[in-house]
Amino acid sequence: MADFRFLQDPASEKWLIMAPKRAKRPDQAKGQEPLCPFEDHLEEEIYTLNEAKVVKNKYPFAPIHEIVIHSDDHHKNFDELPANKTEDVFKVFRQRFLAHKDKGQVYIFHNQGKRGGESLPHPHTQIAVVPEEVKLEIPVLNPRNVVRKELKFHYIFCPNTSQWPDEVWIAPHRGGRMFGQATDEEIQELSFAVSRLIQIFDLRHGEEFPFNFYIYPGGDWYLRLIPRLKTLGGFEIGTNVYINTQDPLETFEFIKEHFDNPDFEKITSQHTASYERSV
């Protein structure tokens, strides 16, 4: 049997991926202290930028499925890596996007923590190139009538229709482009923004919190950061109608207050968040 198959439901016309071999991939996020889980991948490096490395995913669910290993450090992720190393990771994202943009839909996504879908503890991001005929149901950028925090090259906002508590979007001021067209200055600012958001959310939740982010694969690109402390309930799973128990405006005010100069004591004493229960 092939490693994966794309299947379309004839009734709903929605797509799914059948990939039973992925159930056999190692799961080292359960607590044991392993050797580097990517040790046996390094002889097959596809691309390298300083410590950031790209290797093939041994358990793919797409024709092209790569892993970006962030650095040589087994534990430090975006919130703890030096700025230059985080910037290198995002430059690798851009390079791989450009390498694959004519082969399909380049979907860059990151899983952090067990509840965020992470199975290997060494910080890494995945890149899956999905065939064009497979329709990806991803929200499009619609920044109208939203309150923004302005950066030099980007703006940060929390959509009024956020599906997840503390959901945050980052988008460039210059629209109409794909992620591969981001400039070095934009990459530098984007990598800093992601790192800072993770830092203050770590404090807000009192622990290293689980999250996902992805980069929109089409034009008018954006990065969407989704904390994963909330558990989906049966209503949301069955109807695909999400119940958000956190006011996006409160999330935005929290970001606006602490993004530039985080007040660590105030975050931990006054701005903690708790919404782990299902609804």
Residue ranges and their predicted role:
Residues 188, 193-196:
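Internal alpha/beta scaffold segment
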Residues 1-122, 128-179, 198-279:
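Active-site microenvironments that recognize anionic phosphate/pyrophosphate groups
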Residues 180-188:
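Gly/Pro-rich active-site loop or hairpin
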